Amino acid sequence: MTVHRQFLLINPNTSEDTTHRLYQHISPWLPPGIELDVRTVQKGARYISCEASHAVAACALLETWADYLSVHPALDGVLIGCFGDPGLFALRESSACQVTGLAEASFMEASQRGPFSIVTGGVRWKPMLRRLALSLGFGDALRHIETVTQTGAELQADPDMAVQCLTRACQAAALPGVNSIILGGAGLAGYAPLIQPHVSLPLIDSAEAGIRVLLAGGLPQPSRSASGFEARLNHLNPSVLSLAD
């Protein structure tokens, strides 16, 4: 008998187009018995590209998750659909199920091959991703971050331009001692097969890595038996207030 498992993908960007792109790209990876619901946050930036938009996205993610739980309390895992994982630590602290994001999952897969590079859109992401890798324990494995000036939203909107500039970036990121390259970003989902023939190192699609790692279950175990927040969070959605301990 097929075991039914329920997962949730939250896009912390407010772009429904990006949510659709993510779902269309990762849905073929879902085995029988797996249901993946998708939600898009209603507050924040259309596409996260700086510290401020990342911070707002973390709060919006928690509200979206709490709203979902108020209707669907049984949940087996949550995937944060942004290569930057806003709200990862807060959601992991609060959730009774496993949680990961596109960045953490990609780091996990890439590090199995050894040192890795990242290619992504938006120059402000470089220090943010370096900090995230350090906080997750992948600081030594991350050898290089190559950014392109275009944001993930711009790369998503112009596939021909995206493939050209991302190919050049991946070639630049293929440094000695690097064993794989993460193509990071929700808006970059699906570009890896188009770029791979022109790059000598294996490319890791962050969206694919996200769903693979989430389904495999090799993530930190929840510290809670029931979802909830350690502190009462005032002036937020009623669903958030209902989860306060």
Language model segments and positions:
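Short hydrophobic segments within beta-strands
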Residues: 10-12, 39, 119, 184
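N-terminal beta1-alpha1 ligand-phosphate binding loop
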Residues: 5-29
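N-terminal beta-loop-helix "entrance" segment that forms/cooperates
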Residues: 38-63, 153-158
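Short, acidic/small-residue loops that bind anionic groups at enzyme active sites
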Residues: 91-113, 195-214
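Short, well-structured alpha-helical segments in soluble
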Residues: 55-74, 164-177
